[in-house]
Amino acid sequence: MNLRIASRGSQLALWQARHIAALLGAQGHSVEIEIIKTTGDRLQEITFAQVGQITGDKGIFTKEIEEALADGHAHLAVHSLKDLPTDLPQPFALAAIPPRVDARDVLVSVNFESLSALPQGARVGTSSQRRRAQLKALRPDIEPVEFRGNVDTRLRKLAEGQVDAILLAAAGLDRLEKTEWLRQRFEPIQFCPAAGQGALGIETRKDDSATIAAVAFLDDAPTRFAVTVERAALASLGGGCQVPIGIHCRLAADESVWELFAVVAAPDSGKAVRIHHRAPVASDPIALGQLVAQMLLATGAAPLLAGCGGAQ
């Protein structure tokens, strides 16, 4: 089957698209990649939150890609799942979710080995409200610095000394093999990842049964369960990719239960609400995600979300 993948043009996005293309190629499909420039890629001089305010849209990295799917220009899209809005438009399906890689956030620094080693008042670069909020909760003295751009751009700014450290997703650095300055991988109980972080989402049109069948082998059931929980919780809280909510679901080491970590934190005050919950393996993922959201709200998350477009 001839397949066309719609992808953003960043180094990481193309790595991900080529990875999926190679897996499809090994199944005998002919695959090409079409680069699509999204709203989030074009508006590089302002924050993600400001981009969302301008567009009135949570899908700042997906809208144009979905347009390519809708008009038949592409058969599938490869997304970083954390960038894909929870309210997927009606014509589209999340046809496959491959096995997740390291979902953790990491500290990257030239000179400092850990978050605790950063000096008083250190400058730390991040474009994420969620990371900024958790950073302020852990180290109120630190100055978060708005930091956009692709991985190479951020690493260059770090090397130039614009900041003392940056916060990134482990998955991107691992995939691009750019871990020279990776100093600390945060456990979810300390620094909770975004919903879907470390996972890819393969999006297709719902009515494209041939493409859905072609990508079905890529789907990983445990990963799909975990990210469904995370995305259900995020949807219940009214959060998009820039609301300061961290949610992570994983199988316990002995695979006997699901472990869930969640946090809602205020980007400026550092106030945070955290939960750690265990659930039976046979749980319903949607119901479990909704339960996590209810637990967060019951422990005081609503006021923290009120100013960020989340649940009231």
Where are these regions (language model features)?
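A conserved helix-loop-strand patch within extracytoplasmic ligand-binding domains
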Residues: 81-84, 88-142
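Short, structured active-site "lid" loops
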Residues: 46-76
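Short active-site oxyanion
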Residues: 2, 73, 119-123
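Small-molecule-sensing regulatory modules
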Residues: 1-45, 52-54, 62, 137-312
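Ordered, amphipathic secondary-structure segments that act as subunit-interaction surfaces
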Residues: 71-84, 197, 203-208
